[in-house]
Amino acid sequence: AYKLRPFTYIMNLKIRLTVMNFLEFAVWGAYLTSMGTFLFKAGYGSHIGFFYSIQGIVSLFMPGIMGIIADRWVQAQRLLSACHLFAAAFMIAAGLYGMTDGFSIGILFPLYSLSVAFYMPTLALSNSVAFNALNQAGMDTVKDFPPIRVFGTVGFIFTMWAVDFLGFQPTSQQFLLSGSLSVVLAVYSLTLPQVPVRSASSASGEKPTLVQALGLDAFRLFKRYDMAVFFIFSMLLGVSLQITNGFANPYITSFQSIPEY
């Protein structure tokens, strides 16, 4: 059983996890809804779909791989820091390269893809760090985590607006802002409560299979009608969301060139 912590410790912990969630999604909000405008203005409007689809592609395997590493070898808060550091390096490189005249999509896209590949696992890793810290403090994750997580949405909206107000939407400076925030979070993650590394064996003493380690056994839930319907409609919603993220901003900003508007 976990020991009950003093009120001041709990409040301090909540603030620390709130800052983590704010920064986690602020990194994403800096470019997710405005990157399409940058690509469109640069003459690469036909490639917008590739930039947004790569997020889903890397999400099929990178979170599972990083999850195995966090479970067996590297503490989650340290791996969270490392992932953000690599994501920042590639995102800043993409931002700087995008500022050059006549930049090639053949170079920008790999840099961006590598950054996204390291960023996507941090969504799950940050949750692991938060849940472990709350459990260690004897708190209820179902009750106490949602008010903390909502500040992730606040962070996303904050940087989304900041990019607009600073005039970064049609430029690659949005990548520089995202990368800079990743550096901040990489350093900050090292100050968060430690997450113990688990044994390589399961609770039953048996070594988990590769399918179990990657979480692929979760597909068994498709046998349940209600879960199958939920997953299918969630995927369809995700598709429409990415289309909106990629093309809504270029569509709206295109009216700037029409005198009537």
Model region roles, listed by residue range:
Residues 61-75, 166-168:
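Helix-to-loop junctions at the C-terminal end of transmembrane segments
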Residues 6-11, 193-231:
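Juxtamembrane intracellular "pre-TM" segments in multi-pass secondary transporters
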Residues 22, 90, 103-124, 235-236:
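Hydrophobic core of transmembrane alpha-helices in multi-pass small-molecule transporters
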Residues 174-191:
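Symmetry-related core transmembrane helices of the 12-TM Major Facilitator Superfamily/SLC fold
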Residues 71-85:
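Cytoplasmic membrane-interface "Motif A"-like loop-to-helix N-cap segments
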Residues 11-60, 226-261:
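Helix-loop boundary and gating motifs at the non-cytosolic
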